[in-house]
Amino acid sequence: MLAWQDVGAKAAPSHHKISFSVLDILDPQKFTRAALPPVRLAALEAKKSLEEVEAGQDACSGNPIGSQETPDAVGRGIDPGSPVEGSEAEEEEEAEDAGRAHQPERWQGVHEGSPEARAVAVGTEESGAEGLPASPGSPGSPRPRRRRAESSCAKPRRARTAFTYEQLVALENKFRATRYLSVCERLNLALSLSLTETQVKIWFQNRRTKWKKQNPGADGAVQAGGGAPQPGTPGAVAGGGGSATGSSPGPPVPGALPYQTFPTYPATNVLFPAASFPLTTAANGSPFTPFLGPSYLTPFYAPHL
């Protein structure tokens, strides 16, 4: 009987409280005690495990028959066959105590199951969510918004030219006359419309691209057909007008333009100096005979003596 009392006396101070047991709930220091430092906690656990081993050895040596119950087990209402010390609940509690010892200082003095602990845990999660971006793979996290490129790194775009109605009409008329401008024509057109040469050049490039898309293959046909007649002959004007209005869908070519045609002069108004070429060769069938009348075959001045 004394052996049973000794075993009960040794086992009583070494009992371990579970977080959901009656003793833990009724503990007056549940919400006020501070968490132990890791070194002290490790020493306490080592001492506790040593006492549990000694108590288990005494219980095994004094109680060979498993049907008998110890006074401590009777008082606590625990089955002697169930593992009192070293159970899974105890191991979980020890792991929780070790993890609680490594928490920040604000966890000290706060029990795990208390409302204060839940509030601290929620605050920690919120601060972690604000400090670290949510992973794109998690189902509950919103998709990270794609950040727009900074304005300093972006290449500045060229401002679009706003042409007036008069400028557009003049440019269209010029494009109908000719699709390719020379340097002088481009300069004169830009000065007359109060534009820059670059603006006129870019407008013509865009207009040619649009015309080629609307009329595929027409540009090469117009250039090949218009190369035969000379611009000074009447056939060139007629051919140009026919190609514009006939089979070729190119822009119409005006019949009389100052920079495309040459004025014709009668033969009587053309004056050639007599000393520029010999009149005998002109009279004998030279290439200038069609341009000279019979009155111009004689010199205009009397020969010097």
Curated annotation (Swiss-Prot):
Compartments in which it is found: Nucleus; Nucleus, Nucleolus
Tissues expressing the protein: Expression detected in the brain, testis and spleen. In the testis, expressed in the germ cells of the seminiferous epithelium, predominantly in elongating spermatids and spermatozoa. Expressed throughout the brain with highest levels in regions of the cerebral cortex, hippocampus, diencephalon, pons, medulla and cerebellum.
A GO CC annotation given for this chain: nucleus
Post-translational modification: Phosphorylated by HIPK2 in vitro.
One GO MF term: DNA binding
Pfam families: Homeodomain
InterPro entries: HD, HD_metazoa, Homeobox_CS, Homeobox_NK-like, Homeodomain-like_sf
Domain of life: Eukaryota
Residues within the DNA-binding region(s): 156-215
Skewed-composition ranges (Low complexity): 129-140
UniProt biased composition (Acidic residues): 87-96
UniProt cross-references to SMART domains, sorted A to Z: HOX (SM00389)
Keywords: Developmental protein, DNA-binding, Homeobox, Nucleus
Main location: nucleus
Biased composition regions of type Basic and acidic residues, renumbered to the chain: 97-115
Homology family: Belongs to the NK-1 homeobox family.
Quaternary structure (record): Interacts (via the homeodomain) with HIPK1, HIPK2, and HIPK3.
The protein's role, per its UniProt record: Transcriptional repressor. May play a role in early development as a Wnt/beta-catenin effector, hence controlling pluripotency and preimplantation development of embryonic stem cells. May promote adipogenesis in mesenchymal stem cells, possibly by inhibiting the expression of the antiadipogenic factor NR2F2. May inhibit osteoblastogenic differentiation.
Name of the featured protein: NK1 transcription factor-related protein 2
